């Protein structure tokens, strides 16, 4: 354990609760810090804050009073979703107070190796794939991070034999200083969260923080399909191991429908348990990590063949009267929907698309829409999606919401067809998040059975 003395008897302000905030608060308290928790949710509506107070941790709820920072705090640990232009964060930085996320705590309380996975798309699937392959290869792995299990909590339970497999967002990485994974994976890079970061360059810089403490004994796994990611290869002290579906590289690659690692045959691409070209990329990244950590070819092949996917990420839901349903609600941008469509015969696909209108047109998606059986469109962005469908010469049906869209798609589907929810848009015009949107799709499927 690297950090006990770093926080012991130090005053720490924890800004924002949620699941990871509670975990961080309890860990800091356990390590002897003098913790103050500040959360915007009113105390009477905040059972987490109530529980922390009962356990002797100071809690201030209902607002974020700037005068709180007049106290002499040695450290701020913030929820990753809280922006750096938040007045509390700005004041802390102005006073020279270090600002961390709980990922930094997770690193500092555990001595086990970390595999960190970041990128714009594919993080959760790749993180899950890696953990499953490592466990199948008798290399015990624990999932944590942005995937829903607080890293600071999981890190405390890790034993010497374990590897932490950690999904990392740009928001989390911005709050790190000494964080040092043994292997870092960059799945891909496209413009995302620009409202948070300001520019694409700043977004990439936040992602690239994953490797800043790495050395030549560590490994960065990079998607060489992408120019933006490939350009990072010369900007690290770590050893770069690439993967690609487009060229033979000194790492993992696709050639003639087969997956290889440095010339060693691993498996056929069509043996991967989930469809789509993006899942071939995810599998290649997984193969690199597995081989670096000593997993044999048979364990990799068997695990990737059995991989069933992740909820809301091109998840096979089931069949009704020979019609297959796939839930790709996590598809919140054009690239994700392009990747989803790549795994299917368009002539059999009824695509459900549309959602929050962010002002972007969908011209990039037009070539991928050509030949679709039909589209069901909805949400604020429906007029823009309609324009793309018109250019692709695909007929559309309008829907009120996801439940309505699912029913309308099924009504026109025939045996052998595919109903694919892959919205290419965020959910916030109708639903709290992509999980809620996907759950409505799943619930409607159950009602149609």
From Swiss-Prot:
E.C. code: 6.3.2.9
Ligase in keyword set: yes
Source superkingdom: Bacteria
Cellular component GO terms, alphabetical: cytoplasm
Subcellular location: Cytoplasm
Pfam families cross-referenced by the UniProt entry: Mur_ligase_C, Mur_ligase_M, MurD-like_N
Keyword field: ATP-binding, Cell cycle, Cell division, Cell shape, Cell wall biogenesis/degradation, Cytoplasm, Ligase, Nucleotide-binding, Peptidoglycan synthesis
NCBIfam families from the UniProt entry: murD
Protein name: UDP-N-acetylmuramoylalanine--D-glutamate ligase
Name of the gene: murD
């Amino acid at each position: 354990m690297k950090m006990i003395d770093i926080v012991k008897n130090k005053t720490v302000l924890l800004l924002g609760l949620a699941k990871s905030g509670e975990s961080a608060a309890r860990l800091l308290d356990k390590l002897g810090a003098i913790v103050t928790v500040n959360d915007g949710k009113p105390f009477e509506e905040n059972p987490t804050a109530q529980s922390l107070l009962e356990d002797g941790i100071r809690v201030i709820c209902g607002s974020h009073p700037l005068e709180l920072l007049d106290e002499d705090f040695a450290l701020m640990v913030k929820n990753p979703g809280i922006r750096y232009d938040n007045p509390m964060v700005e004041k802390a930085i102005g006073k020279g107070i270090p600002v961390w996320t709980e990922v930094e705590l997770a690193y500092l309380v555990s001595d086990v190796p970390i595999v960190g996975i970041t990128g714009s798309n594919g993080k959760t699937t790749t993180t899950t794939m890696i953990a499953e392959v490592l466990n199948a290869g008798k290399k015990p792995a624990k999932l944590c991070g942005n995937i829903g299990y607080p890293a600071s909590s999981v890190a405390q339970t890790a034993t010497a034999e374990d590897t932490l497999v950690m999904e990392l967002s740009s928001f989390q990485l911005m709050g790190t200083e000494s964080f040092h994974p043994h292997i870092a994976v960059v799945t891909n890079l496209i413009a995302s969260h620009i409202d948070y970061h300001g520019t694409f360059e700043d977004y990439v810089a936040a992602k690239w923080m994953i490797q800043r403490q790495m050395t030549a004994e560590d490994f960065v796994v990079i998607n060489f399909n992408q120019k933006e990611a490939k350009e990072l290869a010369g900007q690290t002290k770590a050893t770069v191991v690439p993967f690609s579906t487009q060229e033979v590289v000194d790492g993992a690659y696709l050639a003639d429908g087969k997956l290889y690692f440095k010339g060693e045959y691993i498996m056929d691409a069509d043996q991967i348990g989930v469809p789509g070209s993006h899942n071939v990329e995810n599998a290649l990244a997984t193969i690199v990590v597995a081989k670096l950590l000593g997993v044999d070819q048979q364990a990799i092949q068997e695990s990737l063949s059995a991989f069933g996917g992740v909820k809301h990420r091109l998840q096979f839901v089931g069949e009704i009267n020979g019609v297959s349903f796939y839930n790709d609600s996590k598809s919140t941008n054009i690239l994700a929907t392009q990747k989803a469509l790549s795994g299917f015969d368009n002539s059999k696909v009824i695509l459900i698309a549309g959602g929050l209108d962010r002002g972007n047109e969908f011209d990039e998606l037009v070539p991928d829409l050509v030949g679709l059986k039909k589209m069901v469109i909805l949400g604020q962005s429906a007029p823009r999606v309609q324009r793309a469908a018109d250019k692709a010469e695909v007929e559309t049906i309008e829907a009120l919401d996801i439940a309505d869209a699912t029913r309308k798609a099924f009504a026109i589907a025939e045996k052998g067809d595919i109903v694919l929810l892959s919205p290419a848009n965020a959910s916030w015009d109708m639903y709290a998040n992509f999980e809620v949107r996907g759950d409505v799709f799943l619930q409607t499927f159950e009602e149609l059975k």
